[in-house]
Amino acid sequence: MIGRLRGIILEKQPPLVLLEVGGVGYEVHMPMTCFYELPESGKEATVFTHFVVREDAQLLYGFNNKQERTLFKELIKTNGVGPKLALAILSGMSAQQFVNAVEREEPAALVKLPGIGKKTAERLIVEMKDRFKGLHGDLFTPAADLVLTSPASPATDDAEQEAVAALVALGYKPQEASRMVSKIARPDASSETLIREALRAAL
C-alpha cells in the first residue's frame, strides 16, 4: 500500500498533518516526536507511512524515517496495543527513549504514558525486548537519546485549545489534558511548544 508520501504541507493540526501529493490531500496521523520535526505549512515534506484499515476508517500514520515506522509496526503487534496507543507511546517519548526503556527494563518510564498500566508496560518490555534482538541493528544505534528540535511556529490565540485537543487525541482525558497545558501555558508559546512541554512534564 502507501509506504511513503512527499508533498506540500497544507495544514498542521497536531497530531494530524494534511499533505498534498499530486493534487490529493492526505490526512496523516503522526507521533508528536515526529510532528515537531516537520517544516512549516507551505513547505515540502517527506513522510514514511503505514496504512491501517478498520471497519469504520482507513488511516495513514506517518513517520520521519523507516526506523520509527518499523518500531510503530512492531508496537501494534503487541497484545493490547493498537495504532492509537502506539501513537501515544511515540508521542510521549522518542523512539530511542522507548528502546532504552525496554532494554533497561524500566516499566516505570512507560506507565507515565496515557493508556499504559503496569501490566501493559511489563508485557511491552517482555515482547519488545525479544523482538529487538533481531531488529535493534536496523532500528537505532545504542547512542544517547535523540534530541528533537524544530523551529517554533508563531503563537496563536487558540494555541492552548489546540494543545489540549492534541493531548486528548493522544489518549489523555480532557480534564487531565487541560490541567497539563495550564501548568506550562504562556502567551508566546505555540501549540506545538505547549504539547511538547506538557508531554515532557508528564514524564
Swiss-Prot record:
- Some GO term, biological process aspect, for this entry: which one? DNA repair
- Region annotated Domain III sits at 155-203
Q: Per its UniProt record, what Pfam families does this chain match?
A: HHH_5, RuvA_C, RuvA_N
Select a single GO molecular function from the record's annotations and give it.
Answer: four-way junction helicase activity
Record key words, sorted:
Cytoplasm, DNA damage, DNA recombination, DNA repair, DNA-binding
Q: Where in the cell is it found?
A: Cytoplasm
Q: Where is this region: Domain II?
A: 65-142
Region (Flexible linker) spans which residues? 143-154
How is this protein annotated for GO cellular component?
Answer: cytoplasm; Holliday junction helicase complex; Holliday junction resolvase complex
Which parts of the sequence are annotated with region: Domain I? 1-64
UniProt xrefs under InterPro entries: DNA_helicase_Holl-junc_RuvA_I (IPR013849), Hlx-hairpin-Hlx_DNA-bd_motif (IPR003583), NA-bd_OB-fold (IPR012340), RuvA (IPR000085), RuvA_2-like (IPR010994), RuvA_C (IPR011114), RuvA_C_sf (IPR036267)
Q: Belongs to which family?
A: Belongs to the RuvA family.
How does this polypeptide assemble, per the annotation? Homotetramer. Forms an RuvA(8)-RuvB(12)-Holliday junction (HJ) complex. HJ DNA is sandwiched between 2 RuvA tetramers; dsDNA enters through RuvA and exits via RuvB. An RuvB hexamer assembles on each DNA strand where it exits the tetramer. Each RuvB hexamer is contacted by two RuvA subunits (via domain III) on 2 adjacent RuvB subunits; this complex drives branch migration. In the full resolvosome a probable DNA-RuvA(4)-RuvB(12)-RuvC(2) complex forms which resolves the HJ.
Q: NCBIfam families in the record, alphabetically?
A: ruvA (TIGR00084)
What does the protein in this record do? Answer: The RuvA-RuvB-RuvC complex processes Holliday junction (HJ) DNA during genetic recombination and DNA repair, while the RuvA-RuvB complex plays an important role in the rescue of blocked DNA replication forks via replication fork reversal (RFR). RuvA specifically binds to HJ cruciform DNA, conferring on it an open structure. The RuvB hexamer acts as an ATP-dependent pump, pulling dsDNA into and through the RuvAB complex. HJ branch migration allows RuvC to scan DNA until it finds its consensus sequence, where it cleaves and resolves the cruciform DNA.
Domains as described in the record: Has three domains with a flexible linker between the domains II and III and assumes an 'L' shape. Domain III is highly mobile and contacts RuvB.
Name this polypeptide is given: Holliday junction branch migration complex subunit RuvA
Organism name: Citrobacter koseri (strain ATCC BAA-895 / CDC 4225-83 / SGSC4696)
